[in-house]
Every structure is written in structure tokens, then in C-alpha cells.
A protein has these predicted regions:
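Terminal targeting signals and extreme-terminal segments of soluble enzymes
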Residues: 1-81, 89-160
Length: 160
């Protein structure tokens, strides 16, 4: 019997689809941001307990990207299986900072490293200045139970 692998809470895996490649069947760099979004939403869903979006009293919180940076350090081709690890840098405010590491599953070669920064807004485009207590507690609990998802960004900034 084969033991099944349990993925860390900050990891997703997927294969490069043909539609995501150029004529040489190498993935197009623009797909990296779509994959980062998938990793970010998967991490948020696990962090706040099964919800893909954060809500405050039934009102959704939006987190538009305000800054992004990517270093393309390798490449992947059609059919390659990739691993995306998403990390978060805890903040004193409601600003969200995510870091990403995209690697090939077969050999662990790094394909891309990146970061995105986000502000948090509520209905009407108003800034959210403080996490609701319930959301803040879920985040603290998640960070203490999953220290591997937390970063200070140093391992990423050096290569960006």
C-alpha cells in the first residue's frame, strides 16, 4: 500500500496546459500571475477556515494587488508538473504581502520567485484598517499551527 502524500497548506500542484504555452511549448510568463492568484486564494481559504474570500459581517473584503514583482529563473514546458508554494508575511496592519516559489516537481528546479502586495478594502472602496477580531484570531491560530507558511521575505528578496 502506498502512503498518500499530504500537501502542506501553502502548496498547490498543477500541470502546464497547452493553452498556457507559446509556439515552443514553453509556458508564457503572463500565466505566472494567474498561478500566483490560485496559490493565494488556496492559502487564504485554509487560513480562515474553508472560505475562499474573507468577509466581515457578510460583507466581502477585497484585496487588490498594489505591487508585484517576479524573477523568472527557469522555464517549464507543456505537461510539466509544477509546485507553487505561497507564503505570507504577517503585518501589524491589514496589508497583505505574499511570496511565491514556483518549482518543477520532477527535479525541484526553480521556475519563478515572486511577491505581491495588497491593500484591503470593503464595500464602496473603503480601506479596512483593522481585522475583525474573529478573522485576526483565525490568522494567528493558523500562523502558530503552520509556521512553514510564514516568511519575513528575506529568502525571496535576495533573488528579486
Amino acid at each position: 500500500m502506498t502512503a498518500s502524500r499530504i500537501a502542506p497548506p501553502n502548496e498547490i500542484r498543477f500541470s502546464v496546459r497547452f493553452a498556457e504555452t507559446d509556439m515552443a511549448r514553453v509556458y508564457h510568463h503572463s500565466n505566472t500571475f494567474v498561478w500566483f492568484e490560485a496559490g493565494r486564494f488556496a492559502l487564504i481559504e485554509k487560513m480562515i477556515g474553508g472560505q475562499p474570500m474573507i468577509e466581515v459581517d457578510g460583507v466581502p473584503i477585497f484585496a487588490p494587488v498594489t505591487k508585484t514583482r517576479v524573477s523568472f529563473t527557469g522555464f517549464a514546458r507543456f505537461g510539466d508538473e509544477l509546485r507553487l508554494e505561497t507564503f505570507i508575511k504577517p503585518q501589524e496592519t491589514t496589508k497583505l504581502v505574499f511570496y511565491y516559489r514556483l518549482t518543477k516537481v520532477v527535479d525541484g528546479a526553480t521556475v519563478a520567485l515572486g511577491t505581491t502586495e495588497h491593500v484591503t478594502l470593503v464595500e464602496g472602496g473603503r480601506f479596512l484598517f483593522r481585522w475583525p477580531e474573529a478573522v485576526g484570531e483565525k490568522m494567528k491560530t493558523f500562523f502558530s499551527e503552520n509556521p512553514g507558511v510564514v516568511t519575513d521575505g528575506r529568502g525571496f528578496d535576495a533573488k528579486l
